[in-house]
């Protein structure tokens, strides 16, 4: 079996480059286009970068809520010799529901090897989808969120799981600022 801790965002090697998407959002793509943002700050309300190859409206809505209300999320990660243990929660019912929904959908996607290829998705997540059959996942829904345990017998997969967990923690702490910083590197 396989699964995913949480959905993680950054540039996918299978999608347009971040620079191209960033320029398009800010009207720097040339020609008659004014860009989707017409010179404004990143669109924190519609978040067009959350769309993927086959993402559902529910998946995108969950991600928007998680990003827009990231300050209401509590997250703890423990690196294990063979993987990770994470706790992600919120005392805000709508945020908790988005977290649980998102984790459940991503665990299913990873088990099926069905990479959503979200525009701002992490290369780490792409790599995890490539090795999804080497990941064991257990989830436990709590009153405020979800515990996730992911393990692998492959040390390289363990490193990917730990990297992904750290990236998700950064996003839960800093929101889209973490994504934009990572994508501009």
In which residue ranges do the predicted regions lie?
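Intrinsically disordered, low-complexity terminal tails/loops enriched in metal-binding residues
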Residues: 1-185
């Amino acid at each position: 079996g396989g699964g995913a801790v949480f959905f993680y965002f950054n540039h996918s090697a299978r999608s347009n480059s971040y620079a191209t998407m960033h320029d398009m959002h800010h009207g720097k793509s040339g020609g008659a286009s004014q860009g989707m943002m017409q010179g404004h700050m990143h669109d924190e309300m519609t978040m067009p970068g959350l769309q993927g190859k086959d993402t559902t409206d529910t998946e995108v809505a969950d991600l928007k809520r998680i990003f827009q209300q990231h300050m209401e999320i509590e997250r703890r990660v423990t690196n294990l010799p063979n993987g990770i243990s994470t706790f992600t929660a919120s005392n805000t019912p709508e945020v908790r529901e988005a977290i649980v929904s998102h984790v459940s959908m991503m665990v299913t996607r990873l088990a099926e090897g069905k990479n959503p290829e979200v525009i701002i998705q992490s290369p780490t997540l792409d790599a995890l989808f490539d090795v999804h059959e080497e990941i064991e996942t257990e989830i436990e829904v709590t009153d405020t969120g979800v515990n996730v345990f992911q393990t692998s017998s492959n040390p390289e997969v363990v490193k990917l799981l730990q990297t992904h967990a750290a990236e998700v923690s950064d996003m839960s702490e800093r929101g889209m600022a973490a994504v934009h910083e990572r994508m501009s590197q």
